[in-house]
Regions:
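Catalytic donor-sugar/metal-binding loop of nucleotide-sugar-dependent glycosyltransferases
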Residues: 295, 304-322
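Cell-envelope/extracellular polymer assembly enzymes that use nucleotide-activated donors
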Residues: 58-64, 91, 302
């Protein structure tokens, strides 16, 4: 049996998809950059701190910072307390672990909780009332720490006995986060302007420690940041628009709604992405979900799926946040291994969700998650180069068919060119355009020929490390039947 036609068709489709995906990524970056620039250009139209102080409708923010072995927690807290928002409507809660207090990391000398207490003593009296510290008594990851702060007794202690959950937003920052000081004002402006949402996800960039990184680390920082702007936020922007368009279409043609809506959910809906920081969910919505999910390693991705399954759209938020990139290749691999383990954990959640409610949307989420994340993540770095070469090779089998021959050569060539152009050149230029809006000045320019050369032609460095992370999980599961993800180490350099 001659498999040449089948292999040719597979290579043709894969190369076409690769080229199309890179073009979509390019468009996604442009969409997000435009979204951010427009918002920062209109900051003067946001409600002032004084106006929010006098407006009883202004939301209250309960900002949670889960922390464990975090030597630079004071920097994150300083960023949060620099926010332009009424003091009485902002509560910052740091949740540490009792086990760390009993046995601090030797390189730190003191526990994170002690660093929080020291920071609190340096605050003026009014600010001390805004900062709370809780300690998780038993074992648990980030989700358990967050949920410890959302216990009814903790909420009553922090917010008072008569708080309204529908007017409280729960924000989440990691202990290395540096938020924009206007993030609360932006959300308040949307809420007071009648454009409110139950959940918001802001733009996060892994550039906080950019100047400390070497060339390889800077390439990875730019590439990891690009994921958030070209995929995560761009998808939320477009999803919001598309869903609203289909809703208007169904309202105008109700007879088509029973067919149109399921078809749209099955073929065109995308997964909603929560990033786990620079993220805000209204308290009553979060309580209706049973607070943060603890079934998997990555509570943020599961939360995004839970919100989507309930028909809740996450609103994209243009305010920027800086976080650290793990500073060694091994740490990047471990970070991606933890994320991939979360991807595997989400399969069981999506399967249960679909069995419980077998809708077109839930089926699409399960299938796309398995195909685009579980399967593609560990193999993409190897499959696409092989398929590209195969496409070039098999094109000559059909050289007598002019158009087929031309397109067969063109798609892998275009995909390769776009990999360098979009991944190595456009991504750098567009992220540099965000520099004026960062919460802290960061010089993102490539200054030497070596930086420019390697940044252009080694733009796949980060993806190779991410692939190693996925295979580390798969190998551990095959060998030991389990994988225990490690926390990102921010102590050693």
């Amino acid at each position: 049996m001659d498999l040449t036609p089948l292999l040719f068709a597979i290579a043709f489709l894969f190369n076409f998809r690769a080229a199309l995906k890179l073009l979509i990524d390019w468009k996604g970056m442009l969409t997000t950059i435009g979204f951010v620039k427009e918002a920062y250009g209109s900051l003067d139209r946001l409600p002032s701190e004084a106006a929010l102080e006098d407006d009883e409708r202004a939301p209250t923010f309960l900002h949670l910072v889960p922390a464990y072995q975090e030597p630079e927690i004071a920097g994150t807290l300083a960023g949060l307390f620099a926010s332009h928002y009424p003091h009485g409507r902002l509560h910052v809660v740091v949740v540490t672990k009792e086990e760390e207090e009993r046995a601090p990391h030797p390189a730190m000398g003191v526990a994170t909780a002690e660093l929080v207490r020291r920071f609190r003593t340096e605050l003026p009296p009014y600010a001390q009332k805004m900062l709370w510290h809780l300690a998780l008594p038993g074992p648990g990851r980030k989700a358990e720490q967050l949920n410890w702060a959302l216990r009814p007794e903790a909420l009553r202690e922090i917010l008072g006995e008569s708080f309204d959950p529908s007017r409280v937003f729960v924000g989440v920052s990691d202990a290395d986060s540096l938020p924009d000081p206007n993030v609360y004002r932006w959300i308040a402006g949307e809420e007071l302007g009648g454009r409110g949402s139950l959940a918001y996800q802001g733009v996060t960039l892994s550039l906080a420690n950019f100047t400390r990184l070497g060339i390889r680390g800077r390439i990875s920082a730019i590439q990891q940041s690009s994921i958030f702007i070209r995929v995560s936020i761009a998808r939320l922007i477009n999803e919001f628009k598309r869903v609203r368009f289909v809703e208007r279409l169904c309202a105008r043609a109700p007879a088509l709604a029973p067919v149109l809506r399921p078809a749209f959910d099955l073929f065109f809906r995308r997964s909603q992405i929560c990033l786990g920081h620079n993220q805000f969910v209204r308290l009553d919505c979060l309580q209706s979900l049973g607070v943060f999910p603890t079934t998997g390693v990555t509570e943020d991705s599961t939360l995004g799926y839970e919100l989507g399954a309930r028909g809740i759209l996450i609103r994209p938020m243009p305010m920027l946040e800086l976080t650290d990139l793990p500073e060694t290749p091994e740490k990047i691999v471990r970070q991606n291994a933890r994320w991939y383990k979360g991807v595997l954990d989400d399969v069981s959640y999506l399967w249960r969700t679909w069995r419980r409610a077998p809708t077109a949307y839930n089926l699409a989420q399960l299938c796309r998650h398995v195909g685009n994340k579980v399967v593609e993540w560990p193999i993409a770095a190897g499959v696409y180069p092989v398929v590209g070469f195969l496409g070039w090779h098999l094109a000559y089998v059909y050289r007598d068919h002019v158009w087929l021959f031309v397109f067969s050569l063109a798609f892998p060539s275009v995909a390769l060119g776009l990999t360098v152009w979009v991944g190595g050149i456009v991504t750098q230029e567009l992220i540099e355009e965000l520099a004026p809006y960062l919460p802290r000045p960061v010089d993102l320019r490539r200054k030497t020929f070596k930086e420019k050369f390697w940044g252009t032609f080694r733009c796949q460095t980060y993806w190779l490390l991410a692939t190693r992370g996925a295979w580390r999980v798969l190998w551990a599961l095959a060998r030991d039947g389990r994988y225990e993800p490690a926390k990102t180490d921010r102590i050693s350099r």
